[in-house]
Amino acid sequence: MAALVAAEAAESCSRNGPGRGRAPRGRLANQIPAEILNNPQLQAAIQVLPSNYNFEVPKTIWRIQQAQAKKVALQMPEGLLLFACTIVDILERFTEAEVMVMGDVTYGACCVDDFTARALGADFLVHYGHSCLVPMDTSAQDFRVLYVFVDIRIDTAHLLDSIRLTFPPASALALVSTIQFVSTLQAAAQELKAEYRVSVPQCKPLSPGEILGCTSPCLPKEVEAVVYLGDGRFHLESVMIANPNISAYRYDPYSKVLSREHYDHQRMQANRQEAIATARSAKSWGLILGTLGRQGSPKILEHLESRLQALGLPFVRLLLSEIFPSKLSLLPEVDVWVQVACPRLSIDWGTAFPKPLLTPYEAAVALRDISWQQPYPMDFYASSSLGPWTVNHGRDRLLQVPGRLALGKVQGGPARPSPAAACEACSCRDEEVSPIAL
């Protein structure tokens, strides 16, 4: 499963009603042929991959064939690279395409690297492990991008039992996760609703329950605890920063441990406010545009440039794929840096840099465009955000234009992952929409 069907297909369903009228064109075009789905040799080859990891191999083969792709690039986070060679062998065996693996680090969906793939001569990119966060250029008809979420099945019964043993009945719980576990999360929420006041919050354009390291929803005050399904703390800390007064728990699906988690909000905010205070007396500014895939936002960079120009503050532009203290120390004449790449780099590692390293939001505070916010905003990719120092600011209004597909839940079952409306331009649309069973 990779995303919702195309907007025109969804609109056709709403006009004709479920199960009535002509089949939507999007579904017919994207339906995987039986000769691929039922190919015994392909099914045998897929058995080499972990059975609980859904790499959507038949769908990938069909999309490559549809596009008549000649050279395919695969991009995936390091945790999935051990499966790359197997996937390459399968795709080259069952398609006419040459397949290559892009080995540069991939931190998230913001790192989708169609630029490098094109430069290497690829006409098709498969991006694994992340949702459709970055819109693709619809004018490039000779290049296609397919997002594969890599849905991971886990021991859902153990997750449910752990929650029941930890929280008393009728507790108000918010469940969040990364895209790999969102289907399991939403199905678990359905099971728990009879015993708890369960919510699966959404921060559009993300799927219900999905959070990023830089983007998380602000939860209602009545929520007593947030439960994060996933390994590691990076994404969990995002929702903790956005909701400092709500207890946070993490269920690791690999160790099968449900643990209480804590975050030093006071220390983090003190460090960031100190950096902002120092920046206000800066005489020269440096603007960093991240070049790791699509991580950098030219729109935000242009906004920062216009603000500094209006205030008569000199600045220099710097393009970097990864930002290290040693690199910035080579430009000692710059008094303060603003990085348009990953906000968490400043939040988590800002004190490691010799000069203040601000996020675009913190730069807005330093330039007095906005006051310091409580709680600290985690809205970098949110459609509804504080200002033009975020990627999708104003997009919530664009999504209300008549004829556009509204983002939300699929009726008749647990909500499916839903990409941004601009995802109509990429190749990640599903051929089916159906609830995921426990």
Curated annotation (Swiss-Prot):
SS bonds (residue pairs): none
Name of the coding gene: DPH1
Primary enzyme class: transferase
Species of provenance: Bos taurus (Bovine)
UniProt protein name: 2-(3-amino-3-carboxypropyl)histidine synthase subunit 1
A Gene Ontology biological process term: protein histidyl modification to diphthamide
Subunit structure: Component of the 2-(3-amino-3-carboxypropyl)histidine synthase complex composed of DPH1, DPH2, DPH3 and a NADH-dependent reductase. Interacts with DPH2 and RBM8A.
Compartments it resides in: Nucleus; Cytoplasm
One term of GO molecular function: metal ion binding
